[in-house]
């Protein structure tokens, strides 16, 4: 089992002009969502970006899922 970095995502002006990247890589998080949006399987993303582990990608997707649910709950409560 891979130990995931903390935090999962790094934002620094030193890397990709401050775009969120997978911590420990120079891979933009947006690339993962671009693949998903295009209907490409996670395995294809992982093959194209071998510096990102499956566990790391899934953890970022889970983070996004939790954020979406939290946002939807706030909107529903209004």
What kind of feature is each model-predicted range?
Residues 2-43:
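A short, structured beta-strand/loop element
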Residues 27-78:
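Long, charge-rich, low-complexity alpha-helical segments
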């Amino acid at each position: 089992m891979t130990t995931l970095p903390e935090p999962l995502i790094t934002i620094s002006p030193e890397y990709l002009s401050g775009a969120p990247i997978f911590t420990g890589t120079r891979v933009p998080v947006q690339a993962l969502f671009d693949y998903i949006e295009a209907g490409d399987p996670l395995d294809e993303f992982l093959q194209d970006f071998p510096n990102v582990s499956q566990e790391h990608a899934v953890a970022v997707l889970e983070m996004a899922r939790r954020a979406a649910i939290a946002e939807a709950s706030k909107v529903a409560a209004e």
